[in-house]
């Protein structure tokens, strides 16, 4: 049976309109013919507020959309054609899955009658993203034109329900379209405005049970992992209330979103944990969210003999890679704090907290001395200096690998609150620049701190510059590639370390930036960093790059020297 191209457009428009009525505000569109009806529909709906961005690389587009979602927690849709285009969405879907971020992946497909018969660009794409997605949803096998508006509304409701549930995450909508695909718009009426729809009930974790065996009157430690959806004002208020009740010190990951807030945080715990036997004795640990990056912290938690309770925010999946937690509550910190008996911190808890804070203060003073704004650039010194020199109104994204680890160990306290972003879910370096561009598009400004290999891995991320309405500033730490492997216990003497692990590249980041019309500047000495950052943050350009050249072998030695210091010897015993 033949169909009219307008029928495909009608169905695509009805689906996108239904998604908009449920809260979808933006779409990232990749090129393709089979996805033509969705492209035309998205274009027609721009007049009703749909923000449309286009990108030629599906992998990059997936990460750009994920960056937008990370910025405000609202779902973003990506539209692609059929075939390998779908496979390129998998890295972003994996990160969205681990980070619990809502992402709608709309992929055009051939009708069922063209499957498994050798038809061009017809693959088993419905299976490609399924392991990483909350749900696989499909339209009619004959084509989306065969769906009524009511069925398309139910499809949209199901997609949003899965994407925004507990946990939030990516949803794959695989949509078959039959030919003809491209309608003539000249005789068609304008798209109707989307009708507001009530979002169906979201998936929620099971109810909160009785109070787990943590005693607020005994000494304890609070460990806060990287930011997740739900770590907003209610979470912070509950943490402040918990601290007033227990007095427990708070060991907060650099990307927890807490540094700079009025909380008694311990930022230098990674270095202080070099001598765990010197720590004030704790009877229990409360872990909030996923695991921080610090390996020393993980080792300490793995050998800790007291109870460890894990509390997550609408995340029912297990968040205990060390298998050391006694239980996990997925309903959030605020609900758990409400169950605590009233009271005040014990004298022992107050004394222990004071000792933690004293050690933290002395450690930060010593790091100021050990990592001055002098001499050649080093990665530990850069982490500390960037924290202090970048104005707090500029959010910072830390690329996976060395930057996030150095910021965790050496950046120290923040004088004012700053949003720090990292993607520690799958810890991939693919999509780094595109992620940052998506965040900058929503927040209007962002500083990305990245290594040279992570930047090179997402070279197509430069292409977002032309459509970027915000300001993205790149600090590229060029250490000749693979500096993170210098920090791992790899026996270098018995192998070709550079060839097998570091994999240094010859691509010039500044030349690559220039090829895309991006202004770039070089920094090789700490003395010039403040002036270089002032240039970097000047308004006007969509993107700018500052390259900081470092020596990864020398930096590896510096890190080890700092990690081996007896930090607790500077702190008087109680």
From Swiss-Prot:
Taxonomic source organism: Synechococcus sp. (strain RCC307)
Molecular function via GO: 2-succinyl-5-enolpyruvyl-6-hydroxy-3-cyclohexene-1-carboxylic-acid synthase activity; magnesium ion binding; manganese ion binding; thiamine pyrophosphate binding
Job of this protein: Catalyzes the thiamine diphosphate-dependent decarboxylation of 2-oxoglutarate and the subsequent addition of the resulting succinic semialdehyde-thiamine pyrophosphate anion to isochorismate to yield 2-succinyl-5-enolpyruvyl-6-hydroxy-3-cyclohexene-1-carboxylate (SEPHCHC).
Signal peptide, first to last residue: none
Descriptive protein name: 2-succinyl-5-enolpyruvyl-6-hydroxy-3-cyclohexene-1-carboxylate synthase
Family according to the record: Belongs to the TPP enzyme family. MenD subfamily.
Reaction it catalyzes: isochorismate + 2-oxoglutarate + H(+) = 5-enolpyruvoyl-6-hydroxy-2-succinyl-cyclohex-3-ene-1-carboxylate + CO2
Co-factor requirement: Mg(2+); Mn(2+); thiamine diphosphate
Keywords: Magnesium, Manganese, Metal-binding, Thiamine pyrophosphate, Transferase
Gene name tied to this protein: menD
